[in-house]
Amino acid sequence: MRILSSDFISKYFGKILNIHPSLLPKFPGLNTHQKAIESSEKIHGASVHFVTVKLDGGPVISKETVSIDPTDDVTTLAKKVLQKEHILYPKVIQWYTQKRLKLIDESTATLDGRVL
């Protein structure tokens, strides 16, 4: 993971997408799978969001979920989430390249003109 400077983010406002291994706004930052397990979550997943100055705080575009089984550990949960990420990110990138997505401000994005 790399944290981008606010100058860089401002220069490319609305042009940077990030995939994050949690159902944002839950568990921003690192160690998301461990945090989900320790919090006794039943559902976990991945989110794609526009990058803004606030870490993992930009508008969420789409999410995919997985169930957390009692036998899951960090490794098995990470594998489940990664499978969903491989579906989710290409879908959102396609929307972006089709110019269907737009970042309005630090907290608002649209898909096909509808606020997300």
Regions found by a protein language model. Name each.
Residues 1-112:
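Donor/substrate-binding cores of folate-linked one-carbon enzymes
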